[in-house]
Amino acid sequence: MLGQSIRRFTTSAVRRSHYEEGPGKNLPFSVENKWRLLAMMCLYFGSAFATPFLILRHQLLKK
């Protein structure tokens, strides 16, 4: 009896957990607006590129 109720709960939980399908729907950010996506990617990759230079500048200016 307990096993049946657990099985019923898990199958109903799986049925309720449907998500949207299609290109870009499984990403943690939206790809619908290409200009916002471009700005976010430039910010992300630009900050990763600039970090070593900013650290170097900080170390050189330190007294």
Curated annotation (Swiss-Prot):
Subunit structure: Component of the cytochrome c oxidase (complex IV, CIV), a multisubunit enzyme composed of 14 subunits. The complex is composed of a catalytic core of 3 subunits MT-CO1, MT-CO2 and MT-CO3, encoded in the mitochondrial DNA, and 11 supernumerary subunits COX4I, COX5A, COX5B, COX6A, COX6B, COX6C, COX7A, COX7B, COX7C, COX8 and NDUFA4, which are encoded in the nuclear genome.
Main subcellular location: mitochondrion
Record membrane topology: Single-pass membrane protein
Tagged with keyword Mitochondrion: yes
Mitochondrial matrix side: 17-33
Protein name: Cytochrome c oxidase subunit 7C, mitochondrial
Protein role: Component of the cytochrome c oxidase, the last enzyme in the mitochondrial electron transport chain which drives oxidative phosphorylation. The respiratory chain contains 3 multisubunit complexes succinate dehydrogenase (complex II, CII), ubiquinol-cytochrome c oxidoreductase (cytochrome b-c1 complex, complex III, CIII) and cytochrome c oxidase (complex IV, CIV), that cooperate to transfer electrons derived from NADH and succinate to molecular oxygen, creating an electrochemical gradient over the inner membrane that drives transmembrane transport and the ATP synthase.
BP-aspect Gene Ontology terms: mitochondrial electron transport, cytochrome c to oxygen
Compartments, record wording: Mitochondrion inner membrane
GO CC terms of this entry: mitochondrial inner membrane; respiratory chain complex IV
Listed Gene3D superfamilies: Cytochrome c oxidase subunit VIIc
Top-level lineage group: Eukaryota
Keywords, alphabetical: Acetylation, Membrane, Mitochondrion, Mitochondrion inner membrane, Transit peptide, Transmembrane, Transmembrane helix
Transit peptide, residues from-to: 1-16
Mitochondrial intermembrane side: 61-63
Transmembrane segments: 34-60
Pathway: Energy metabolism; oxidative phosphorylation
N6-succinyllysine carried by residues: K25
Naturally occurring in which organism (per UniProt): Saimiri sciureus
SUPFAM superfamilies in UniProt: Mitochondrial cytochrome c oxidase subunit VIIc (aka VIIIa)
Keyword Aminoacyl-tRNA synthetase: no
Modified-residue entries (N6-acetyllysine), positions: K25
Assigned protein family: Belongs to the cytochrome c oxidase VIIc family.
InterPro entries: COX7C/Cox8, COX7C/Cox8_sf
Coiled coil: none
Organism classification: Eukaryota, Metazoa, Chordata, Craniata, Vertebrata
